[in-house]
């Protein structure tokens, strides 16, 4: 399935196989978290989102929490579609995952390090996820 979310002139598409209506009801929150992460990173870096589109694909059984690619991010379904009553920790993990993978659009896709420096990129990004996600944790 595909669902689109639009804010101003920016459109984001989500692709997924989930059919549970209770889980699909979380898409609005996920879209808002992705959009907030994009805005925060644009403000933080002073660089507009650098690619023509942004999509995310929620995959059943995906082996990682998330993996960004230019213009699209793959996410594990269990990391994105939470239980009907998620704990604050589960919501925080999802929010930080979105912030982390979105940050890769600037730090990894727009500016790519050579392979020998990849360790540094993975160590730097955790410092951007907490401040990026602090502004859009549900209920705060």
Regions found by a protein language model. Name each.
Residues 48-56, 113-117, 140:
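Surface-exposed patches in mature extracellular/periplasmic domains of secreted proteins
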Residues 102-119, 136-137:
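Catalytic Zn2+-binding segment of zinc metalloproteases
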Residues 1-99, 128:
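Hydrophobic helix-coil surface modules that form long, contiguous segments used
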Residues 27-31, 115-123:
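Active-site metal-coordination segments of metallo-dependent hydrolases
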Residues 42-46, 107-108, 130-138:
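Sec-exported extracytoplasmic/periplasmic mature domains
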Residues 9, 123-140:
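Acidic/His/Gly-enriched intrinsically disordered linker/tail segments
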Residues 98, 102-107, 125, 129:
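Active-site His/Glu-centered metal-binding helix of metallohydrolases
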């Amino acid at each position: 399935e595909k669902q689109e979310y639009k804010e101003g002139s920016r459109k984001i598409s989500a692709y997924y196989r989930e059919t549970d209506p209770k889980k699909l009801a979380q898409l609005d929150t996920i879209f808002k978290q992705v959009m907030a992460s994009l805005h925060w990173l644009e403000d933080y870096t002073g660089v507009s989102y650098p690619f023509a589109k942004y999509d995310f694909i929620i995959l059943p059984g995906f082996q990682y929490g998330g993996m960004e690619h230019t213009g699209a991010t793959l996410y594990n379904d269990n990391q994105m579609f939470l239980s009907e009553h998620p704990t604050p920790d589960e919501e925080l993990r999802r929010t930080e995952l979105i912030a982390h993978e979105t940050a890769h659009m600037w730090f990894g896709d727009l500016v790519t390090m050579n392979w020998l420096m990849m360790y540094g990129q993975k160590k730097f990004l955790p410092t951007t996820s907490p401040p990026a996600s602090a502004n859009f944790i549900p209920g705060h």
